[in-house]
Amino acid sequence: MVRFTSFTSPFSAILLLSFGINKVATASTNTCVVAKSDSDDAITILEAFEKCKTGGTVVFPKDSTYNLNSIVTTSGLKNVNINLAGTINLPVREESYRNGDYYIQIKGTNIKMYGGGTINGNGQAWWDALDRTAPSVLRIAANDSSFGNFNIINSPRAHLNVTNSTNLLLHDFIIHTVSNNSNPAKNTDALDLYHSSGVIFRDSDLTIGDDCLAVKENVTKVTVSNITCRGGHGYSIGSLGMGGRRDFVTQVNVYNSTCIDCQNGVRVKTWAGGKGFVEDINFTDIYLEKAENPIIITTHYCDKNEMGYCNNNYETSLDIAGVHFKNIHGSGSDKGKPIINLNCSTESPCSDVTLTNINISKASNNTKNVCVNLKGSDKIPECSS
């Protein structure tokens, strides 16, 4: 049951996104406080969204806890505020959720989600079962919208999955997903981006088991800043081109961010045989601490969970051009990997790749830097060290 009230706000709340002047959320005319259900709080959550889907505010009150036993799918939201001040617990692992896309979907235009609350993914059972088929926690498909100032913990897979979105601000997240035993929290990306344009991700603290950022197929105009990531797989473009797919990523700027004890630091990864292009990528002012692979481009990425798409055709992949690494500093790990590993394809070599002011301390066993099929590598000092 939803407690439903009406009021007239004296003003409109307008958020000016730094990539434009788009309005995010407007004055609400209705407030829907999500009630508790006797069986499945997904039912009352959906009821609240239905009543307040146009010009309303959906409220999860502070100190309230909601337990889901089914998927929450919203669509057609317009001018909606979501005040998540309470806690949402996702379902425990069940066969019916395997290979699902998401647990919660928020879809619409001019949405603002905030509140300081928490979504708990209950991921431990998935990690203990070594099951990597869990859904993402939160899928966002939204235009001219803002999501932030709430927490996501114990995600069974990706925390934030953004698709088919434009002019989107993601900010002030605390994301914390760590296993309580020896079974690692694998495939728990903080943010996956697909088919989107004009996305800002900033001012967030991440402790995860996979990519801090994964900019995937058909994405353009992304800005990432002031992120601290711990224990993850770094800031990644890709993976792209799996199974010969045609993908593109352009105009991505990642700056003023940190990766501590990360497997990778800053990375571009594409599959052999993939088609499309990657261009205008900038990693600037990045601090890496004990990164196993601090700076890496690979055009023959292979995920051992997708071996059917792995092949030995290293001759072609996506065209990679205009990737710039600037002011990257910190330290490499003692795993014996090269500090810089730029390994491109024979028939589609990388071009216009620059390394400027790279200052990453080596361990005693770091191997020589790698620059393969990289146009202009003879003019890059790091390629000869």
Swiss-Prot record:
Subcellular location: Secreted
UniProt-listed GO biological process terms: carbohydrate metabolic process; cell wall organization
MF terms (GO), sorted A to Z: galacturan 1,4-alpha-galacturonidase activity; polygalacturonase activity; rhamnogalacturonan alpha-L-rhamnopyranosyl-(1->4)-alpha-D-galactopyranosyluronide lyase activity
EC number: 3.2.1.67
Main location: secreted
Gene Ontology CC: one annotated term: extracellular region
Temperature-related behavior of activity: Optimum temperature is 30 degrees Celsius.
Its job: Specific in hydrolyzing the terminal glycosidic bond of polygalacturonic acid and oligogalacturonates.
Stated family: Belongs to the glycosyl hydrolase 28 family.
Disulphide-bridged cysteine pairs: 212-229, 344-350
Gene: rpg16
Protein name: Exopolygalacturonase rpg16
Tagged with keyword Cell inner membrane: no
Residue ranges of PbH1 repeats: 165-195, 219-241, 249-270, 278-299, 350-376
